Structures are given as structure tokens and as C-alpha cells.
Curated annotation (Swiss-Prot):
This is LexA repressor. It comes from the Bacteria. Coiled coil: none annotated. The record marks 123-124 as: Cleavage. Belongs to the peptidase S24 family. It comes from Rhodospirillum centenum (strain ATCC 51521 / SW). CDD domains: S24_LexA-like.
Length: 237
């Protein structure tokens, strides 16, 4: 026999998996059920797991699978969401991006535009970005604005809480400045390129990951150069 909160959480997870194929984050579950802390979500998930309703998928950050539903589930009562909408927050990349990424101008008179495909984003570990200048991808013009753009591929599952799945392609608009909270491609120390959320803290810049298993990294402003911002995502089925 499940408690009402357990049933509500189980149905919430089930609906999110059915709609998007991605488990909700602990923060999303906490807010959906109107709880004040994530410790309550941990207890509910443990109870559901012990009763055989869900299981945690190994080697995947907070990935859950619904094994069964109660015969007479309680109606789902989800608290209204008040937090900032979840933005795309892809993972870490590396490569020689010190030279300007040329990108390509978007064309308003076509249904799709071909963009250079500059590399893959590894799950949890930085890797050398692929710089094959012959690689490209056709992108619907509705995903891009004016200016130069390029694409990066995603590999792995460490960004599933942000809706970024293995095999996704992220679309980046070249820029040298960005507003606080924007997901950017940042060049650190003219050596490492990373795709993170930008947080300015005084004279420092924090590069914020999506996965709580990874630490936010803080640098002096002179060590970080913005190479572009995230504007879209493509997923193949």
C-alpha cells in the first residue's frame, strides 16, 4: 500500500518519462509535490524502490525506471511551478577553439541551413573536440537567429536532468558577451572549452554544471572568453 505522496511521486515520474523519456530532477520532484526539501523525495523514492514500483538505473545520474503502477492510482496533484524554467545545460567539451569559429550565416530564404559540426560533448569527462571542417549538419532555420552559428554533438547521459540526451546536437550562436544565467561555450585559459551556465560573481566568472555530482568552477574574468551561447537542440529518433 502506497501513501498518497508516494503515489503522486510515482505518477509524476511516470508522466515525465512518458512525455519526454527523461526522469525529473530531484528539485522538480520536490517542487511538483510541494515539499520543502529533497530529503523527503529521497525517502519517497526509497520507499517506492523497496516496494518494487521503481528502480534506479546503474551508472546513470538519478535515472529512474517505473516498473509498475498501483491498481487504483491517486489523482496527481502537482504544486504550481514557480522556479525559473529549466534551460538547456549541456556538459563539458574540450578542443582547440582558440581560433575564431567561423560559423555560417543563417539564411532567411531557406527552410534549413547547413552549419559546421565542430565536435562531441562527452558525458562527464572532457575530450578533444573533433575539428573536421568537412562535417556539417542541416538545421531548420526556425532554430537559429541572425549571426554565425555552429553545432556540437552530445555523448552520454550526464545531462539527462536538463533534457539533454545522448546523440543530441546543440546549436550555438557565436557571441563574445552573454547575460548572467545564459548557457555558453566558454574558453578557459586558452586551452579548455566547456559548455556551462554563466554566473558572474563580482570580478569572477562561475561556470555552473547541470549535474550536482560536478562542482561549479570559478575563474577570474580574464581567464574566460565566451565563444557562443546555446540557442537550440536537435534530437534524432
Amino acid at each position: 500500500m502506497l501513501t498518497r505522496k508516494q503515489q503522486e511521486l510515482l505518477l509524476f515520474i511516470h508522466e515525465r518519462l512518458k512525455d519526454g523519456g527523461v526522469s525529473p530532477s530531484f528539485d522538480e520532484m520536490k517542487d511538483a509535490l510541494g515539499l520543502k526539501s529533497k530529503s523527503g523525495i529521497h525517502r519517497l523514492i526509497t520507499g517506492l524502490e523497496e516496494r518494487g514500483f521503481i528502480r534506479r538505473l546503474p551508472h546513470r545520474a538519478r535515472a529512474l525506471e517505473v516498473l509498475r503502477l498501483p491498481e487504483q492510482p491517486a489523482p496527481l496533484r502537482v504544486a504550481p511551478r514557480t522556479e525559473e524554467p529549466v534551460r538547456f545545460r549541456p556538459n563539458v567539451i574540450r578542443g582547440d577553439f582558440r581560433g575564431a569559429l567561423p560559423g555560417r550565416e543563417a539564411r532567411g530564404d531557406a527552410e534549413a541551413v547547413s552549419l559546421p559540426l565542430y565536435g562531441r560533448i562527452a558525458a562527464g569527462l572532457p575530450i578533444e573536440a573533433l575539428r573536421d571542417t568537412t562535417a556539417s549538419i542541416d538545421v531548420p532555420t526556425g532554430l537559429i537567429a541572425s549571426g554565425e552559428h555552429y553545432a556540437l554533438e552530445v555523448a552520454g547521459d550526464s545531462m539527462v536532468d536538463a533534457g539533454i540526451l545522448d546523440g543530441d546536437t546543440v546549436i550555438i550562436q557565436r557571441c563574445e558577451t552573454a547575460e548572467n544565467g545564459t548557457v555558453i561555450v566558454a574558453l578557459v585559459d586558452d586551452n579548455e572549452v566547456t559548455l556551462k551556465r554563466l554566473r558572474r560573481k563580482g570580478n569572477s566568472i562561475a561556470l555552473e554544471p547541470a549535474n550536482p555530482a560536478y562542482e561549479t568552477r570559478v575563474f577570474g574574468a580574464d581567464r574566460v572568453r565566451i565563444q557562443g551561447r546555446l540557442v537550440g537542440l536537435i534530437r534524432r529518433y
